[in-house]
Amino acid sequence: MTRHARNCTAGAVYTYNEKKRDAAESGYGTNAQRLGKDSVKSFDCCSLTLQPCRRPVITKDGYLFDKEAILQYIVTKKNEYSRRLKEYERLRRAEEDKLSQEANSKQQARMERFVNAEKPAMTPAHSSAAASEKPSTSSAAAAASSESSSASSISNMTNGHEKKLPSFWLPSECPNAGLAKAQKPDATIYCPVSQKPLRVKDLIDVKFTLLKDGDTKRSLIAKEARYMCPITHDVLSNAVPCAVLRPTGDVVTMECVERLIRKDMIHPLTDRKLKEKDIIPLQRGGTGYATTNDHLQAKEKRPMLQA
């Protein structure tokens, strides 16, 4: 009986299983993982802190945040923009100084070439007389210049070369290494979830209606069913699609929106006229089903191995 199971490593095809195993062990390539129910926040939790919101606010795209957390995020992004703007100004000034120095050096070189071209040429008789007057000096100078040129061509510690590193493999010593190109930073603050422009005045206060269950012993966070629809009194959960009414911030179920509100487009609590943009669907929490949430795959970018 041959040992086929022991000789299964000599295949001519690089299988999918081998690729996945090698990618996991080598540390290269992008890692992807399917998110389960425990990895997705609840519908009433902040998208930044992943904790139940104390002062909930919602964006126009339906992402819920704690007001303190999202304001702190906006302040941090503004401070980061100020820091990047200062760095941009510094790089721009350095680039302007470099360009002015190059222009000055080119102008100086042109002036020197012009002056040298305008100098009168020496006659042959004058040049021979000058050479006959000091033959020893010219020969000594020629010998000294030849020695200095030979020394400079051999040694790397003369004529200022001792300050230059011979480490050609360093990024700063590469031929194309230089000052970073100045790029003006973007002043727009983007939503940390949807990556769309975010402004403080676009945040809408959300008002959850507490569920009247009569249980006063447990805290609100310890309860699984915490809120209800103020119109139908249905319990709100991750499996129940909800929407926020912009004028008052009340959270109602989508079933209530479709059956009661969309008929007349009137707010059932205040009798105010509603528009389509006043109904903001709330992003749902994790239920464990693939059709509930849009983004259920987490990716970790790692270095790519190129052959």
Swiss-Prot record:
The UniProt record lists the keyword Chloroplast: no
One BP annotation, GO: mRNA splicing, via spliceosome
Residue spans of biased composition, Low complexity class: 127-155
Keyword Cytoplasm attributed: yes
GO cellular component terms, semicolon-separated: catalytic step 2 spliceosome; cytoplasm; nucleus
Name of the protein described by the UniProt record: Nitric oxide synthase-interacting protein homolog
Principal location: cytoplasm
Cellular compartments annotated: Cytoplasm; Nucleus
The organism's place on the tree of life at top rank: Eukaryota
Transmembrane segments: none
Function: Negatively regulates nitric oxide production by inducing nitric oxide synthase translocation to actin cytoskeleton and inhibiting its enzymatic activity.
InterPro entries: NOSIP, Znf-NOSIP, Znf_RING/FYVE/PHD
Assigned protein family: Belongs to the NOSIP family.
Keywords: Cytoplasm, Nucleus
Originating species: Drosophila melanogaster (Fruit fly)
Region spans: Disordered: 120-159
Classification via Pfam families: zf-NOSIP
Recorded GO MF terms: RNA binding; ubiquitin protein ligase activity
